[in-house]
């Protein structure tokens, strides 16, 4: 009986320890933020055009590319804000009334990349995330959706978008973050929020 109880305890502890610590590996925001800040004039211009906080744009640049306009990820996300031509890039083109998707050279252009990144954040805020009332919760929801998709986030609350937004509005920023830690299927989702806060604090 004791052996059976010990085995059960080991399974429980293993389950608890399987949740990744979003703070590991460590991330120092100081250098990437400094590099991202060089693009602030463009971020301010794009932010004004699309109604997006330029500090949020700068934080995303720091997190996504460390301020490198030529960065290309393994999944072919490109440029300062690491946009994928076939997904976020196509969404922005559609929003602008254009056909097709941006080219690699277009996404490596700092002004075009930041403009499209700001446009995509606006699409998220005024589309699937519309109705979130708390500004900080909206900011957290934006970065999680930017990285992992709005649908994946909303489904952790409800399969119905309206009900999901209502549940989100019952939470403050800390409670929203804890919900993401406990329920989002992507382990990088809470880490992205944590990195966002680190980046904003470093500005």
UniProtKB/Swiss-Prot annotation:
Lipid attachment, kind S-diacylglycerol cysteine: 16
Main location: membrane
Protein's name according to its UniProt entry: Endo-type membrane-bound lytic murein transglycosylase A
Naturally occurring in which organism (per UniProt): Salmonella typhimurium (strain LT2 / SGSC1412 / ATCC 700720)
Signal peptide feature range: 1-15
Described purpose of this protein according to its UniProt entry: Murein-degrading enzyme. May play a role in recycling of muropeptides during cell elongation and/or cell division. Preferentially cleaves at a distance of more than two disaccharide units from the ends of the glycan chain.
Record-stated family: Belongs to the transglycosylase Slt family.
GO cellular component: cell outer membrane
SUPFAM superfamilies linked to this entry: Lysozyme-like
Lipid-acceptor residues (N-palmitoyl cysteine): 16
Enzyme Commission code(s) on record: 4.2.2.n2
Coiled coil segments of this chain: none
GO molecular function, one term: lytic endotransglycosylase activity
Any single biological process term in GO: cell wall macromolecule catabolic process
Membrane topology: Lipid-anchor
Annotated catalysed reactions: Endolytic cleavage of the (1->4)-beta-glycosidic linkage between N-acetylmuramic acid (MurNAc) and N-acetylglucosamine (GlcNAc) residues in peptidoglycan with concomitant formation of a 1,6-anhydrobond in the MurNAc residue
Keywords (A to Z) from UniProt: Cell outer membrane, Cell wall biogenesis/degradation, Lipoprotein, Lyase, Membrane, Palmitate, Signal
Compartment list: Cell outer membrane
Pfam families: SLT
């Amino acid at each position: 009986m004791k052996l059976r109880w010990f085995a059960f305890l080991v399974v429980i502890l293993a389950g608890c320890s399987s949740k990744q610590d979003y703070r590991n590996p460590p991330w120092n925001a100081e250098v990437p933020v400094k590099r991202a800040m060089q693009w602030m004039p463009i971020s301010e211009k794009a932010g004004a055009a699309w109604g997006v906080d330029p500090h949020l744009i700068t934080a995303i640049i720091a997190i996504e590319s460390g301020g490198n306009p030529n960065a290309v990820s393994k999944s072919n996300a490109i440029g300062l804000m690491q946009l994928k031509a076939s997904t976020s890039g196509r969404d922005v083109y559609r929003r602008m009334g254009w056909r097709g998707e941006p080219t690699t050279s277009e996404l490596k252009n700092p002004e075009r990349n930041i403009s499209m990144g700001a446009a995509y954040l606006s699409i998220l805020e005024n589309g699937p995330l519309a109705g979130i009332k708390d500004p900080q919760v909206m900011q957290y929801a934006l970065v999680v959706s930017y990285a992992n998709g709005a649908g994946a986030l909303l489904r952790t609350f409800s399969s119905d978008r309206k009900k999901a937004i209502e549940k989100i509005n019952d939470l403050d920023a800390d409670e929203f973050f804890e919900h993401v830690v406990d329920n989002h299927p992507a382990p990088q989702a809470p880490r992205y929020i944590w990195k966002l806060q680190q980046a904003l604090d470093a500005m």
